Amino acid sequence: MAQSTKQKVVIVGAGPVGSLAALYAAARGDEVEVYELRGDLRDPSTIPLNFTKSINLALSERGINAMRHSNREEMIHKVLEEAIPMHGRMIHGRDDGKLWEAAQAYDVHGRYINAADRSTLNNALLDELERTPNVNLFFNHKLTGADFRANKAWFERRIPGESTSDRVEIQVNFDYLIGADGAHSASRYHMMKYARVDYQQEYIDTLWCEFRIPPTDDGDFRISPNHLHIWPGKEFMFIALPSADKSFTCTLFAPAGHYARLKSSPQNLLESFDTHFPGVCPELITPKDLQEQFETNPHLPLISIKCKPHHFDSSVVIVGDAAHAVLPFYGQGLNAGLEDIRVLFEIMDKHGVYNPDISPEMRTLSRQAAFQAYTDQRIADAHAINDLSKQNYLEMRWGVKLPLYKLRKSIEETLDRYVPSLGWQTQYARVSFSNQRYSEVIKAVRRQGRLLGFGFISAIVSGVAVVGILAWKRPREASVLSVLKSSARQLGDVWRSKFR
């Protein structure tokens, strides 16, 4: 006789990752309860945890594919309809007093990433959950404790305006809990009381502050809406992403010491922008608005988190930033979190967690095996995108201007376009336009680098050999051979340092 596959699933966190997890569990017949510390995220008065009103997200293939597997086509259509395609980077600079901009396409096949508004995405997911009968949403509930051996959790209801004495704590039983409550995760904190978790947290010496480029007086974009705009500056950078209201959401990334200098004097701020980010002020943001936004908007740190395992027994698994907060420089934080959900439920399906013909006891054992398999697979990928995101910061703030970066990109894109059978792709294309595991991306890119390096050195050696033969025939030209040998050694050193 077939057993019921219904499980009680508690999800902590109603952001995009937690909401997608709820849709996946609900689609499999589970009874789902979602608990969120903040008020209803669809309410404009709800204050985000980072105290910023709007953060644009880069939504790419991994995130879209994960949402696609929820089988909610109308929801996905709504999100993408309001998103803005970004076909590449637009690099800004100034030479000899003249402003310039140079476009760098993301992909030779015309693929693009999407600038999506966080609230639009989150609202669409929450609206879908509210229409789902086996899902219940609980806002203003803080996770205060959990017993992951007894499968119990405690939440404190915190209604704004209530005194602490009026707060009520409730107990919730569950079959398993998904922690999707961000970098400062309470789920992870309580899981670490039961699992032996290796945990690494790092704050890099970079702060970020949000700015806004308004639309023109005619209500249009001031700069190209189909690019991610970058003003690179070695130690810092300024970026701008398009928004649906024809404005741009901008971010200044800089060391804490640089922020301190900017805060010391309004003139320092204006001079710094003129020197390092030419064309931003006054062309796109007035000096008054620039100063006001810098003083009003918070200057926030960037956190990077690695941990393992991502689960305990059959009762809890953490996903998204709770498991692997990454720096924002690859635009993969959201995409990796949404991909977590697809991978997790695919593994649970593979292990028969939702098989109607097994007993509750066997279902628990299957879930335990699935969570272990998820940890074993996902840790390598989570650590990989963490490392890639750190590396991409250097590329964005300086590497995009280097000739060697452009050379390698050109070679790899040429091979991708004209010899597709080789399976050659740039690192960016593999990360943003495929569902290849992040850990496999690193291996593939390293392999390509070695092959390019071998071809590069071979070309130099061939040239040296030709000149050597000529020099042997004409001894008076032997000095040419010496020069070429020296040049070959130097180029080889450059290649190894840049492309290894």
Curated annotation (Swiss-Prot):
Signal peptide: none annotated. It is found in: Mitochondrion outer membrane. Transmembrane segments: none annotated. Pathway: Cofactor biosynthesis; NAD(+) biosynthesis; quinolinate from L-kynurenine: step 1/3. Its cofactor is FAD. It holds the Pfam family FAD_binding_3. Its EC number is 1.14.13.9. GO terms for biological process: 'de novo' NAD biosynthetic process from L-tryptophan; anthranilate metabolic process; kynurenine metabolic process; L-tryptophan catabolic process; quinolinate biosynthetic process. PANTHER family: KYNURENINE 3-MONOOXYGENASE. Belongs to the aromatic-ring hydroxylase family. KMO subfamily. Catalyzes the hydroxylation of L-kynurenine (L-Kyn) to form 3-hydroxy-L-kynurenine (L-3OHKyn). Required for synthesis of quinolinic acid. This is Kynurenine 3-monooxygenase. The lineage of its organism: Eukaryota, Fungi, Dikarya, Ascomycota, Pezizomycotina.
